[in-house]
């Protein structure tokens, strides 16, 4: 039996903690087969991003075409796409090949709060890419930007998830890892939860786990989204895939919390 095939479309992290490298490691660890399309080459490490070199849009298209024509992935995970022309290229390819599952981790804002793409690119993403996605996984800053209001707690997370889902006709997972408190809370809004899902009156599903203190969290968003894509490719319903992916992330954080790789925010 063939393993599920997952295509990651994202940037390269030379230090191995995030981006394509984190996606490949995650997909492989969960029993999938990882293919990759690189949208940008970054010079970065645990201390930060030093330089970014965008891959030309025609080369991004060539990579996607090569993978799609031969492998036909069961799911696609999209990460760093900070140029409008690359977004349009990806959208054109997705419309041509129509993969069943598309998970997008919108890398729009850095950890320090700096925007990583222009307003033009954000608008193209909103109007062209979002409607094609199965799931979008913004963190608090990104969800606040998309929603137009600051999110400070789980009440706003639920409101944002529901309204963004209706606005863009896709499922939304708002990640609350940066919330104050002892728990790590994420909120999912999807149209068709599984029969056993614990759905709130708002229609949202709240995932809450004790927060694990660790300096090794670089690549957490990449790992979560690629894990969700892998579980979706394996036949899980969306809320089940999110639940399993969060369990995987929790285990990874706990097992790696005492490691010392690099001098800054270490890899997950």
Task: Tell where the protein language model's regions lie, with residue ranges.
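Conserved phosphate/ATP/ADP-binding segment of small-molecule kinases
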Residues: 119-204
